[in-house]
Amino acid sequence: MKNFISLLIAIGLTLIGITASAESNWVTDYEKARVAAKVGKKLMLLDFTGSDWCGWCMKLDKEVFSTPEFQNYASRNLILVKLDFPRKRPQTEALKNQNEQLAQKYGIQGFPTIIVLNSQGEKVGELGYTDGGPSPFLAKLETLPKS
């Protein structure tokens, strides 16, 4: 029984680590991300989401963004920016204002909406939920101009 409990604890800690590492690739500060994209010559992926209430957003996170395939691709090619509109999770006023201004700038009307910018900050694509896991989503990203 003691070994079983130890095993459950180890599995739980591993899962927490996987979730934390997937989340750690996302930033919330748009300006810092913009500079990083420019310096790194990477695309910027803006994820407009309702993380704690939007079913399609949660599905996109689970089926695409949290997968090793997407994480590996993103680490080489993307600066990931989470622009969240939660209903239950608290946010600072500065973060709320930033997210609302960006949603207005890009004409966001529903969630999830993914806006892709090139390293110069120009919009090169717009995506939503894509069925089939990370491969079809990454295939769509690959068709977008890089500069």
What are these model-predicted stretches?
Residues 54-57, 114:
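The canonical Cys-X-X-Cys-His
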